[in-house]
Amino acid sequence: CALPILDYAHLKGVKVYLTVNTLLKNDEIEKLYDYLLPFYERGLDAVLVQDLGALKLIHDRFPDLSIHTSKQMTVTGIYSVRFLKQFGGQRVVMAREVSLAEMKEIHEKCGMEIEAFVHGALCYSYSGQCLFSSMLGGRSGNRGRCAQPCRLPYCAGNKKDTYILSLKDMCGIKDLQKLKESGVYSLKIEGRMKQAGYASGVVAYYRRYIDSMKEVSDKDYKNIAGLGRSEEHTSDSSHESPSRM
């Protein structure tokens, strides 16, 4: 049961955000209230959602519970953010393809907390829109079961075992000042299905440079970038590329 984990985290002064960021079927969404109620009563800090029906249900039944909208919603613009805000969205995790300039404009015109991906895998498709894993092996990314077939080698022409679909990992630790200037409220670091040592190590590096806002040393950058599948800056990959959308 996850409830003791919630209590322990709060004892240590750590907030807990519960992920419900998949598309829900009819029978599942009918059970959502009963599923969330024990967490809500224990002081859950926020819930992360993808399904619009779940968003409305949570807003109606738990009006004082903070709702964060997942990158699986593929939120890319001002009107989407304004719509989500009407249904209780407090924070929006922007699609990884959104530029820093676009995030800044959204923040200034919508007044909603912006969360941005800064470290981890980049999707070959678009956030929340990829059906590759679902079509290839029946494991849908929109159900939290992506098998990451894009990481596998494929044949391209006369070339065998080429990783043509496997993107470099994002590493945005050198772009913290730009993210701050864009109005980004929170940073998202990939941790799901990762070992605890990886997650704690990456978070520790980001925490250090967020607190100091000093220029990242070459040694630290090499260390943190080496934890993933090579690297790209946020400014060189998703957050500044006009062709990603």
Task: Set out the residue ranges of the language-model regions.
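Beta/alpha (TIM)-barrel catalytic core signal, keyed to glycine-rich beta->alpha loops juxtaposed to Asp/Glu
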Residues: 74
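Conserved nucleotide-cofactor-binding alpha/beta core module
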Residues: 78-79
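Short, small-residue-biased leader/transition segments that mark boundaries at the very start
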Residues: 1-3, 232, 236-245
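Surface-exposed amphipathic alpha-helical tracts and adjacent flexible/coil segments at the periphery
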Residues: 4-22, 26-40, 49, 53, ...
